[in-house]
Amino acid sequence: MEPQPGGARSCRRGAPGGACELSTTAESAAPMSLAIHSTTGTRYDLSVPHDETVEGLRKRLSQRLKVPKERLALLHKDTRLSSGKLQEFGVGDGSKLTLVPTVEAGLMSQASRPEQSVMQALESLTETQPPATPGPGRAAGGGFRKYRLILFKRPWHRQGPQSPERGGERPQVSDFLSGRSPLTLALRVGDHMMFVQLQLAAQHAPLQHRHVLAAAAAAAAAARGDSSIATPVSSPCRPVSSAARVPPVSSSPSSPVSPSPVTAGTFQSHAASTTCPEQTDCSPPASSNTTSTPGSSPTPRSRKPGAVIESFVNHAPGVFSGTFSGTLHPNCQDSSGRPRRDIGTILQILNDLLSATRHYQGMPASLTQLRCHAQCSPASPAPDLTPKTTSCEKLATPSLLQGQSQIRMCKPPGDRLRQTENRATRCKVERLQLLLQQKRLRRKARRDARGPYHWTPSRKAGRSDSSSSGGGGSPSEATGLGLDFEDSVWKPEVNPDIQSEFVVA
């Protein structure tokens, strides 16, 4: 009997008759080595299991090269690896694969790019399962968390081992959701690059997650875990937007929730005049009712689900900060009500932020307004978004809807912002009018200098007076010529000291 390929013959002495049996070797379990050659001449040696799929190999290369897997194409003996297992294409140990980058050409849907960018950034993270012990960012019995989030669109040098761009073996999703390290994501928003850094912190409010955006200037301190950089304050003195458009935040654990369709949000900076559309495919939370504090009147009607932006500050062109709150979707929570430690939770957090931006109205506040907002806000974050009466308010806010529609003294209302914009526009228009007037005067001076007759300003004034006073005079005076007959119309520009014969000559 010939030995079977891929197997080895082993005989057991205890078997009756000295029978031998075939035992499969561990060759199938051993990893196989692949040589990845790129079109630029770079070579990578990669070890993958024998049952590795094409999608898994592309994901490994995406994490190693920091390139979206949709932009990678693999060739094996002039055959493109599309889907399925590597063995189906004849790939074995020591096989050579060619890595070809995918070039986009033609028209593409602009709405699909941000969604792919978010998913590409999240899929490049490592998702090692965390230990069973709760992390420092775990709140007691709640699916809500507080985040310090740094958002800016300027290219910056990432530092520290927390950046997912540095790849590696660290479980980035687990470390972020357990509060051990911040998470940095590089997102493509149209023609811009947007960097988002999130830091998980404990929140005492049950079933609530609060996102606190810190200044981009404090990025280095935030990466070290300095919690004094962010200002985790709620916004009882600053309305987010109109009462009919702000989505609610349910503070009741028993409120039913249901998924909602995909919504798109925009980051808009009036100072930098840049708009960043974003769209993700994670369903934002939905709540059918809104709870308020005892003694307050119920809301007239339920509003659309989603997060609420409490404050928004523009620190520099392209650098934004603020706070917003929302509810984790039940699909992002485990049986104990804690957030699941996977990319779906992070995607839902980003979707809350991006969905809430289109409901926010008004110009980003300055740092001085942020200090005013901090004085009007309570010392500790409120567990819910129901406004509370402070010294900066003139009127009481009995409900959430009424509180958000009231005009606060800390933040300038929309009319004041529009007045400021109108004043700046008027200044620009007046300056343009002044420049045009100066240009007209210079052009008139050049035209008068090229004319055949040089009229003095006094003679021009005399002509205008004679033309205006042509009532009882002769018809010739009424014509308005206003010629001064005491002086000749034309004077020779010669020196009077010269003798007459030279003048005639």
Curated annotation (Swiss-Prot):
SUPFAM superfamilies reported in the protein's UniProt record: Ubiquitin-like
Biased composition range(s): Polar residues: 263-282
Location of the Ubiquitin-like domain: 32-106
Keyword set includes Cytoplasm: yes
Chief place where the protein resides: nucleus
Gene3D superfamilies: Phosphatidylinositol 3-kinase Catalytic Subunit, Chain A, domain 1
GO molecular function terms listed in the Swiss-Prot or TrEMBL record: kinase binding; molecular adaptor activity
Keyword Transcription included in the entry's annotation: no
Low complexity composition bias: residue spans: 238-262, 283-300
GO biological process: negative regulation of glucokinase activity; negative regulation of insulin secretion; proteasomal ubiquitin-independent protein catabolic process
GO cellular component: cytoplasm; cytosol; nucleolus; nucleus
Keyword tags: Cytoplasm, Nucleus
Cellular location(s): Nucleus; Cytoplasm, Cytosol; Nucleus, Nucleolus
UniProt-annotated stretches for the region Disordered: 155-176, 228-305, 440-485
Induction comment: Down-regulated at high glucose levels of 10 and 25 mmol/liter glucose with highest expression at low glucose levels of 3 mmol/liter.
Entries under Pfam families matching the protein: ubiquitin (PF00240)
Function: Facilitates the ubiquitin-independent proteasomal degradation of stimulus-induced transcription factors such as FOSB, EGR1, NR4A1, and IRF4 to the proteasome for degradation. Promotes also the degradation of other substrates such as CBX4. Plays a role in inhibiting the activity of glucokinase GCK and both glucose-induced and basal insulin secretion.
Quaternary context: Interacts with GCK; the interaction occurs preferentially at low glucose levels. Interacts with the proteasome.
Protein name: Midnolin
Organism, scientific name: Rattus norvegicus
Protein encoded by which gene: Midn
